[in-house]
Design a protein with these regions (language model features):
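Sec-dependent signal peptide cleavage junction
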Residues: 18-33, 161-175
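A short beta-strand-turn-helix
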Residues: 27-44, 74
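Short active-site neighborhood of thiol/selenol oxidoreductases, capturing the structured segment around
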Residues: 41-55, 80
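Extracytoplasmic/secreted cell-surface and envelope-processing proteins
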Residues: 56-57, 135
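Detector for the c-type heme attachment site
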Residues: 58-62
């Protein structure tokens, strides 16, 4: 009987963990969907600029974006976009057509070049405000622990009042 109770407890725990794991998924939008949604419910836009050959991009997708805290912040404070920097799709934004003019393997899309201001480094995250205006680009891999304060810094509009270093220092003293 004890073994049966233990087995049921373990299975119940696994189902609970599975439920939490499902809730921890980031709701990803296309760039166009995020811009369209922003017309009716204003949020900042988080754009993960990646390539399919980038190892750090894959690590960030598998670890950072799978973190339930990160997923929750992205799902509630942002429209999260995963943007393939080498896509062949034509994207309309602010009355302009963005395309991939290179036509070769690994040629960057014009929108990726614009978002990253010509500094083609992967992974990178571009942030747009609620009016779809560029805020900044943050290049490089970020673990969940490093990304969380960055997400909050922009979500809370703290970037309008103080440097990121001051924001992080202030958070440490209040926690």
């Amino acid at each position: 009987m004890k073994k049966l109770t233990l087995l049921i407890s373990i299975l119940s725990f696994c189902f609970i963990l599975n439920g939490f794991a499902q809730e921890a998924k980031v709701k990803w939008y296309t760039f166009e969907e995020a811009v369209e949604l922003n017309k009716t419910e204003k949020r900042k836009i988080f754009i993960d600029v990646y390539t399919d050959w980038c190892g750090w991009c894959k690590k960030m997708e598998a670890s950072t974006f799978a973190n339930p805290i990160i997923a929750n912040i992205l799902n509630t404070e942002y429209y999260a976009v995963r943007f393939d920097a080498e896509t062949k799709d034509t994207i309309s934004f602010k009355g302009k057509q963005f395309i991939n003019v290179g036509g070769k393997s690994r040629s960057p899309h014009q929108l990726a070049v614009a978002l990253l201001q010509g500094k083609m480094s992967y992974p990178s995250v571009a942030y747009l405000n609620e009016e779809n205006q560029f805020i900044t680009t943050v290049p490089g891999y970020y673990s969940p622990e490093r990304l969380e304060p960055v997400l909050n810094f922009f979500a809370e509009d703290a970037f309008l009042r103080q440097s990121f270093q001051d924001y992080v220092s202030q958070q440490k003293t209040t926690n």
